[in-house]
Amino acid sequence: KSTLVNLIPRFSDVKNGSVKVFGHDVRDCKFGYLRHVIHVVPQKSNLFSGTIKDNLLMGDRSADDRDIDFALKVSQSAEFVSKLKDGTNTLIEEKSKNLSGGQKQRLCIARAIMGHPRILIFDDSSSALDFATDAALRKALKENLNDTTVFLVSQRVNTVKNADKILVLDDGELVATGTHKELYKTNEVYRDICLSQLSEKEVASV
C-alpha cells in the first residue's frame, strides 16, 4: 500500500505506465511543485527540535496564527495543545518524550494540513489514534478540506468505509474497487476484513 501511494508524490517512479496528477505525468512535474501540492503523513510520526509552532510552520512557512489554529482544529490537536502551559510555544523534547504517540501523530497531521495541499496522503498514519478521535478526524477532514483530495491508507475498515472509493489490495495486487457497500456485497477479501473488525450491528447495517 505504501509503495503505491509513494508513486503519487514521486518518492519512487513507476517502471511501467504512468502516474498522473491533475492530468500531468508526475515525471514531467518539478519536485518543488509536487511538494507544494502534495503533503504526506507517513506511518512513523517524526517531529523535530523546536516548538510545536516551529514544527507546524515546516508545512507552510508563510502561515499565520489563523492557519495554525485551523490545522490544530482539523487534526484534533487543539484541545490537548491548549492545555499545555506554553501552548504552541511548547518545546518538543528529544524523541518527543513529552508527547504521547497519538499526540505526535495528530501534530504530524496538523503539519501536513498546513498550506492547504491539493492532495493529502495518510499512509496508515492514524494507527495511534483511538477510534473516537479517528472518527472525529475523518469527519473534520471531510467538512473542512473540500478542495483537497484525501488518500487514506489503512487496515481499519472504519477509517475507510465512508470514502468515495475504496481500493482493496491483496498480496500487493489490486483486487477490487468500489464503495463500502458495493465491496461488502461483491468482494470476498473485503467482506472477510469487515467481518473480522465490525460488530454484528455494523455488519447488519451494510
PLM-predicted stretches and their roles:
Residues E143-L152, V160:
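Conserved catalytic loops of ABC-family nucleotide-binding domains
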Residues K15-D25, K165-I166, L174:
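ABC nucleotide-binding domain "signature motif"
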Residues K83, K139, K161-V206:
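C-terminal portion of ABC ATPase nucleotide-binding domains
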Residues M114-R118, D147:
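A short, proline-enriched helix->beta-strand linker immediately N-terminal to the Walker B motif
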Residues L120-D123:
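Catalytic Walker B motif of ABC-type/P-loop ATPase nucleotide-binding domains
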Residues I8-P9:
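Helix-to-loop junction immediately C-terminal to a conserved catalytic motif
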Residues S18-K20, D28, R35, K53-E94, ...:
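ABC ATPase nucleotide-binding domain helical subdomain, centered on the C-loop/LSGGQ "ABC signature"
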